[in-house]
């Protein structure tokens, strides 16, 4: 079973620890692999993965994005008992798992960028992540206050997403709830910020803060939101 600890494209919704523990227990009882997709969450909120903090024990973990230092990358980590099937030096081709390879596999530039990024995060982790996560909390509070009950802002740490509510939706607990929200208004809101204030969002998607963002960026987003709300109220 493959699961994201925080839904990315599904609405930026963090799973509860109890839910993830339940999924892991289900996998153990049914002799299934418990696989965590931490491509978005790995090294996003802390130096490491979410599963470490939640005391989960996944069989396989996937990583990407941050561990590549801004360059394309995909990483598969796992327990020896499973990863041994990808070992080309000990198993014959017919006995091992297929691992695709190519010109850009283990690209030296990506490896250097990723290693440099992780080294900097390791050395400055506590201060860096505290600042970044606090900015995310401040952003979510600002958006909820500005829209005054007309949206729910989901997310965790430095990730956030604004959901424009419809009459039948009062909470966002899963991807089904998120899909029932007014995506047109979300697109309109994002296009407003892009066109009028140069604040870029991939329309209809989540927001992700980085180390270069400061409180002034949150202030700019708040000002742009005020401009959007002028027309929104009409």
Predicted regions and their residues:
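Conserved N-terminal phosphate-binding loop of PLP-dependent enzymes in the Aspartate aminotransferase
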Residues: 2-234
